[in-house]
């Protein structure tokens, strides 16, 4: 009995430590004040717009152009003709606030904050590494819209160099998707060979993550190579060391809570994943592709993909078999993945994420019921042994070795395992932690309502009703479990305070997680009633 209570206390401390540790690990450095260009008129920037190529000259001259607007069923995008950068991206189907029409803006460029996606051609003859500045593309119109019945939308931009070479940059948007194809077509009509190299990078003002101890979230970069499936690269590390990792395939991304932007070059191409931080506090991460030689009279096509949207594991996996890892479940990912799958499965039937969480709770409690029954049976047997254990303590006094041997012989004789009731508690803790990360990381739960006052399962209960009910349920459970007479008085006081401690902790937890714990406690109370009734019939009162 005492060992089980100790394990419960240790479990609480362990969960608290994990949350505190994750919060410390994901804290970003303080933001650096910067001045960036206003979106109303797009401008090219200094040489930081273009990464270092194998050969090439940094860009220098700035220019101003009107933006090109692209609207699909999922995205509202603005493209700067200077370089063809995506300087604004709003997610039409994801709102900034629940119940309001304003879309969530992921990419933007304002006076105080920059978060944009850049791409271009560098190298010896790259149009974006010229000393005159980046290429200024021309478009047939400034507004493009995905029409009804249209599955894809092409936005072609054209640039004719001084030597007569035509460069076409085509953005291809898709219905129902957040990924954009960026295709370059180089028609070398000159008499000299060309050498170019495509790059794609994401530029963001260094900004701390909006997280708390109970809801830690990560804001920063991440990348994948052939040798490293997934690795976070926070802003602080980016400021200390620049990435320069050759790889086949790979990807580079910027992450924040629920959303991601990522460059995904072709999986079979030779690329280099790079990063840098400019003096103005702008963090860059991206890729440089292979160097292409374009002979006179030849045509060369170079492609890549860019994703800007929610952390949708299915959509991300379709682009790269490791991109779905940006949904980071931590060290218990192997347990969180099936929990997420089961959550999605239940929701597809009931159409309510709160009900799906309740069904997961019933599933977990049902699977653990045989162990729970064994736990309470073991506890009852241990209570019946208390007089004999007390007799052993009086007989052997301070001789702990002999008393320990006598206790083990007694347990063996009575067929009692003193640790037999601990397994359900040990199993519940990793399930609790895994579900915590599922509820924290799964974008599907963002703005997902349950019923009554719970309008968003991904945030804390606005009225703290669920945490208080959870505390009451813990108090009832505690009263149903008799306290061993041999238990230390200090431990008794600590256990009496456990419902209060848990309630305080859960005040700031996502309401979906509190719902899971509350329903679990209610089911546990019912199970205890059933088990105790069976034990009384067997005389294990």
From Swiss-Prot:
The chain crosses the membrane at residues 6-26, 325-345, 349-369, 420-440, 457-477, 500-520. Signal peptide: none annotated. It comes from the Bacteria. GO terms for cellular component: plasma membrane. Interacts with the Sec translocase complex via SecD. Specifically interacts with transmembrane segments of nascent integral membrane proteins during membrane integration. GO terms for molecular function: membrane insertase activity. It holds the Pfam family YidC_periplas. Keywords: Cell inner membrane, Cell membrane, Chaperone, Membrane, Protein transport, Transmembrane, Transmembrane helix, Transport. HAMAP family: YidC_type1 (MF_01810). The lineage of its organism: Bacteria, Pseudomonadati, Pseudomonadota, Gammaproteobacteria, Alteromonadales. GO terms for biological process: protein insertion into membrane; protein transport. It is a multi-pass membrane protein. Belongs to the OXA1/ALB3/YidC family. Type 1 subfamily. It is found in: Cell inner membrane. This is Membrane protein insertase YidC. It comes from Shewanella oneidensis (strain ATCC 700550 / JCM 31522 / CIP 106686 / LMG 19005 / NCIMB 14063 / MR-1). InterPro entries: Membr_insert_YidC, Membr_insert_YidC_N, YidC/ALB3/OXA1/COX18, YidC/Oxa/ALB_C, YidC_ALB_C, YidC_periplasmic_sf. Required for the insertion and/or proper folding and/or complex formation of integral membrane proteins into the membrane. Involved in integration of membrane proteins that insert both dependently and independently of the Sec translocase complex, as well as at least some lipoproteins. Aids folding of multispanning membrane proteins.
